[in-house]
């Protein structure tokens, strides 16, 4: 009996060593293919943005490549991005957008992606992002007089945007513009003024003929614009400087018919954003906030000074393929280093990659 047990143990050990465990291989973060996947991920972010500003790739932090059955492989990617000066509605190509500098109170994004590579094609399976402005301490060390981001719901910000849009409409020979979103604001100490950036939408009214703005409707072919304004506080009056850039009209996208199989979802048009939605705490899905019949109350969201990328993908489920893929990043993996021999010594992982602009 003892001999049989010993033979059984030896056979089980043989099976364990004979069958290779599923593992990933680590990838050079500055490898051309890794950069290609990262740029695809950034495009995915910007294509889903309806508010805030476009982001650009700053650094690739980590790349893991998982095998997938029956074919293909999945890139698990961590990247850093930086906010640009191009609004999400601005059709300017990302390559022509300037990165917002540290002295302008830069915003950094942190994103996790899973991207499928199959038959030479890349497809985003899942995305998770958040973004954070640079700390006030770091900015003031570099530039003591630089204004910081101001909460978008500040009364002075709302008044400045309204005053700037009113001033622009009074001199505008085209369509009457309505406010869509206050995107960014700063309180400038000297001279005392409020700097604000906001988006607008054209209506079916002529600006100089409007008597009742409530009767003006947005155009069927949506046409948006982006405005920058400085409203200075003078004695008994305000001094307004405002410029607006109107983008080409967007053609109407056909709405999916109810009950039609395979109908594609249409992104909603941007809307006025008086308050940001409450996001679930880190590590919790929206469904986890409900325990039996009891709804767990959430604290009100703090005033925000920028559009957090977390809201772009909030509530969006993972799109990981259910076709029997061998992709389990939650399990303890076997790491396979590419082109690494069996020689003893520490393995140097070529990650994180290079910083393309600056790190905050």
From Swiss-Prot:
Residues recorded as bearing Phosphoserine in the entry: 131, 135, 318, 321, 323
Keywords for the protein's UniProt record, in alphabetical order: Cell adhesion, Disulfide bond, Glycoprotein, Phosphoprotein, Repeat, Secreted, Signal
Domain of life from the UniProt record: Eukaryota
Main location: secreted
Domain Cystatin fetuin-A-type: start-end pairs: 24-130, 141-252
Single GO cellular component term: blood microparticle
Any one Pfam family match given in the protein's UniProt record, by short name: Cystatin
Modification note: Phosphorylated by FAM20C in the extracellular medium.
InterPro entries associated with the record: Cystatin_dom, Cystatin_Fetuin_A, Cystatin_sf, Kininogen_Fetuin_HRG, Prot_inh_fetuin_CS
Disulphide bridges: 29-351, 86-97, 111-129, 143-146, 205-216, 227-244
Location of the region described as Disordered in the Swiss-Prot/TrEMBL record: 260-285
CDD domains per UniProt: CY (cd00042)
Signal as UniProt keyword: yes
Glycosylation sites recorded in the entry for this protein: 96, 153
Gene Ontology biological process terms from the UniProt entry: acute-phase response; cell adhesion; negative regulation of bone mineralization; positive regulation of phagocytosis; regulation of inflammatory response
Expressed in which tissues: Bone marrow.
Example of a GO MF term: cysteine-type endopeptidase inhibitor activity
Location in the cell: Secreted
Family per similarity comment: Belongs to the fetuin family.
Function of the protein: A cell adhesion protein that binds immature cells of the granulocyte lineage.
UniProt-recorded name of the protein: Alpha-2-HS-glycoprotein
Species this chain originates from: Oryctolagus cuniculus (Rabbit)
Gene name for this UniProt entry: AHSG
